[in-house]
Amino acid sequence: MKLDIVLIMFVTFSTTLAQHDEREEWYPFRFGNGHVGCSNRLGMSENDFCRKLCNQDGKWRNSKCKEHYCYCGPQRFYRVIKL
């Protein structure tokens, strides 16, 4: 009986976590009045550059580059700074 409950909970949570990225809302990264593109002159890949832009305020966010524009997800975790 306990094993059945644990199994049901495991399947429910793993399914929820697996589908989480699909339901996540993505927001375009904006600077001024424009939408920021992923291309850069720093020699970084588009995904790395987009990640750097989305996380510049010290908060963990998912990021993605879609159609050469940068999109940021909602805040995940605060960064922990080790001294």
Swiss-Prot record:
Name listed for the protein in its UniProt record: Putative potassium channel toxin Ts20
Taxonomic placement: Eukaryota, Metazoa, Ecdysozoa, Arthropoda, Chelicerata
Keyword flag Nucleotide-binding: no
Gene Ontology cellular-component terms listed: extracellular region
Subcellular location: Secreted
Modification after translation (UniProt): Contains 3 disulfide bonds.
Native species: Tityus serrulatus (Brazilian scorpion)
GO molecular function, a single term: toxin activity
Keywords: Disulfide bond, Ion channel impairing toxin, Neurotoxin, Potassium channel impairing toxin, Secreted, Signal, Toxin, Voltage-gated potassium channel impairing toxin
Main location: secreted
Signal peptide as annotated in the record: 1-18
Annotated tissue distribution: Expressed by the venom gland.
Domain of life: Eukaryota
Role this protein plays: Reversibly inhibits potassium channels.
